[in-house]
Amino acid sequence: MTTNYIFVTGGVVSSLGKGIAAASLAAILEARGLKVTMMKLDPYINVDPGTMSPTQHGEVFVTEDGAETDLDLGHYERFIRTKMTKRNNFTAGRVYEEVLRKERRGDYLGATIQVIPHITNEIKERVIAGSEGHDIAIVEVGGTVGDIESLPFMEAIRQLAVQKGRERTMFMHLTLVPYLAAAGEVKTKPTQHSVKELRSIGIQPDILICRSDRVIPANERAKIALFCNVQEKAVISMKDVDSIYKIPQLIKAQGLDDFVCKRFGITAPEANLAEWEQVIYEEANPTDEVTIGMVGKYIELPDAYKSVNEALKHAGLKNRLSVKIKYIDSQDVEAKGFEMLEGLDAILVPGGFGSRGIEGKIRTAQYARENKIPYLGICLGMQVALIEFARNVAGLADAHSTEFNAETKNPVVGLITEWVDSEGKVEERTENSNLGGTMRLGSQLCHLKNGSKARELYGNASIHERHRHRYEVNNNLLPQLEKAGLKISGLSADKKLVEIIEMPNHPWFVAAQFHPEFTSTPRDGHPLFEGFVKAAGQQLRGELK
């Protein structure tokens, strides 16, 4: 199969939405029956985002095969059916690490290692390997044109266009077209300068996606086309919208998919966007609004919980409910008490690391349990629920996780020292292992217990969900917890690790060690989130029993 490439770059400012724009184009092309994949190239020196601060970088998205990747891969999976893998995201750090490994091994036969050709060749090889077996590969380069760290990536995609042929490659550039109220018009000069910068490194864009807070007039688009040497029909106006799921229709209406197919010589049926039309309809026509409290420690940057936010919205669509997320700092719960949690229809405690705010999360789980508020715990959210139950129901007053208190006499949560990874290999860890790349990662099999809420929600005896954790329930203390009423409703494939717990005498209290948010999509939703938001609606109406 011959693969065609669309390279996506950004200019003027960061955070223009390259990932959303690229994913929206991919969704349209997929709707035309084409096999599409996507890649994200990140110019930073970290090997992967696994150890980066969520408040700087946003969430770490975990793929089925256990790669810790950029949050844009979450957008890709929410817009297209293709599942991302470790091949779909790599960083400058990963590239340099591999080149240096090859140099130490002697693979370069004593050559002087340079950015060109060694670094650029490594980038090209990874792009080609990650795109095999697809009609179109859309490759997004992180950062902004002109950034010094992105230059090797820009040079690599320039070379790829030469090697693969311009008939098989396209460049799509996102740029800002600001509106100046004082002048009463949009200004195209920033776009012109951004394209000039791109052309100075040998890349002529074929498509310009022009971001603005309004529709860009036809005469301004013609002006951009003239000065940037781009066909007028390839200058796409992408205005701000109230839902990212409207963007596929927005750019299809301007014929971008037709332009791409014609350029690549691809004959494909018209895109069927009925599923996206249904998503937009459900989003625009909720029957009620529920308020869900998300109690976390990274709330100053909502993107730290991007997939959770989106999964809640998806579940709202399936229940015809608008979901209002109230972000609550777990440290505020510690300082101000339960008053921070009053008036919520449901409570969600997401994943996280470190001891800051941990007691606030434990108290949150207590409040939800005692007041019969629907509760969904994810990863750490399950562990704090377990700690709270052990302390206040099972009578283990000093129960804790060894992550936060290594000296606790009742470690209900401890470090996993051995497990089988997603490829079937045995992994071993100790307290002294590196932080990066040392967690239980990727899709894992989970067996669900008959008669449990989890089994009812999923409708299956076994499921696969994605993990990202290094601490797990201590099986030695499970008998005491189960005797006190704790329900274990999900176990790992070898039945050694607890995956899901449920609380007794509670209408809806489910907590999972895995991350269900990573597999939720706007078209399909996710059973755990759908059940959770449904329970929130019942709580709102006073119907939850």
UniProtKB/Swiss-Prot annotation:
Positions of CTP binding: S14, D147, I148, E149, K187, T188, K189, P190, T191, Q192, K223
Region (Amidoligase domain) location: 1-266
Pathway noted in the entry: Pyrimidine metabolism; CTP biosynthesis via de novo pathway; CTP from UDP: step 2/2
Keywords: ATP-binding, Glutamine amidotransferase, Ligase, Magnesium, Metal-binding, Nucleotide-binding, Pyrimidine biosynthesis
Main enzyme class: ligase
Residue sites binding L-glutamine per the record: G352, L380, G381, M382, Q383, E403, R470
Pfam families registered for this protein in UniProt: CTP_synth_N, GATase
Record's catalysed reaction(s): UTP + L-glutamine + ATP + H2O = CTP + L-glutamate + ADP + phosphate + 2 H(+); L-glutamine + H2O = L-glutamate + NH4(+); UTP + NH4(+) + ATP = CTP + ADP + phosphate + 2 H(+)
Note: CTPSs have evolved a hybrid strategy for distinguishing between UTP and CTP. The overlapping regions of the product feedback inhibitory and substrate sites recognize a common feature in both compounds, the triphosphate moiety. To differentiate isosteric substrate and product pyrimidine rings, an additional pocket far from the expected kinase/ligase catalytic site, specifically recognizes the cytosine and ribose portions of the product inhibitor.
Family indicated by similarity: Belongs to the CTP synthase family.
Subunit-structure text: Homotetramer.
Name the record gives this protein: CTP synthase
Source species of the chain: Photobacterium profundum (strain SS9)
GN (gene name): pyrG
